[in-house]
Amino acid sequence: MYLPSLVLGLLGFGLTASTSPIEERSNRSKAPAGCLTVGSSGTYATIGAALSALGSSTSDACIFIGAGTYQEQITIDYKGKLTMYGETTDTSSYKQNLVTITHSISSPEAGSLDKSATVNVRSDGFKMYNINVINGYGKGAQAVTLVANADKLGFYGCSFVGYQDTLYAKAGRQYYSNCYIEGAVDYIFGDASAWFGECDLVSVGPGYITAMSRTTADETTWYAIDHCNIYGKPGVDLTSAVYLGRPWRVLARVIFQNSQLSNIINPKGWSPMATGATPLYYEYNNKGAGADTSKREYESPISGAVSIATVLGGGWNSWVDTTY
């Protein structure tokens, strides 16, 4: 169901799906050329309807979503490369996003983690710009906001809000830039190789930021949190109540580097989870009240920052939007 915004009547929309060029950072109040359009003045009233209209094509495509709140649960399994744009007054950040996709269901109610997700991405090469995604279930059970289960995914200026298991970085290579990620318990988890650059990771309750599930030594997967801000939601006292992570599987591998760690981080830094785990947990060049490593547990030494090529592999700049 679509809940219109007052500004939608001012917008103009295109009609067809095709490739569109990377935009410069600016106001995005109308559809990039060639995009299918969603909203009160668009061709489609719901995001799901626009996705259905893409059909079985394998051509590159894009969808523009006009300002408003969309009460939907969507699966993105398009066979071509799809880009989804949200209306915003500032494309360089999540802070002025005008589009929200929201749904509320827990994993036990839905039957699985994937089925609880507000947005479930299964399409290789998918990109999302300036869209807020929420699972409003709250405390009490796992309830996923985003399942990212494909290769070469990019999320730019997006916001992901949940409580337990917000962002399921499940598999493939993934890039998150200037995003907002909110939760309390294991709110970034899975076995993707994921780079989080210049993101805000915001805890709303005691718990664990990451729960990485690398299982075998030959897996090349990492979570790299680089130049990010880690803090608690204003008004919630979480002093020393949050851990950087715990290993969902035995060989979890995570680095926090070049980031600001607030006083929410417990001096121990990391916590146990999987039986017999020997995780690889690294910290490098972080600042702030939570960055003191003198009392850390489970931390491994490292001599320098991890590169994006290490995390995402060679050729990463052929699919990452390096202008963002």
Swiss-Prot record:
Active site per the UniProt annotation: 165, 186
Residues the record marks as site: Transition state stabilizer: 164
Enzyme Commission number, as recorded: 3.1.1.11
Annotated GO biological process: cell wall modification; pectin catabolic process
GO molecular function: pectinesterase activity
Signal peptide: 1-19
UniProt cross-references to Gene3D superfamilies, sorted A to Z: Single-stranded right-handed beta-helix, Pectin lyase-like (2.160.20.10)
Subcellular location: Secreted
PANTHER family, alphabetized: ACYL-COA THIOESTER HYDROLASE YBHC-RELATED, PECTINESTERASE 53-RELATED
Function: Involved in maceration and soft-rotting of plant tissue.
Name of the protein in its database record: Probable pectinesterase A
Biological classification of the source: Eukaryota, Fungi, Dikarya, Ascomycota, Pezizomycotina
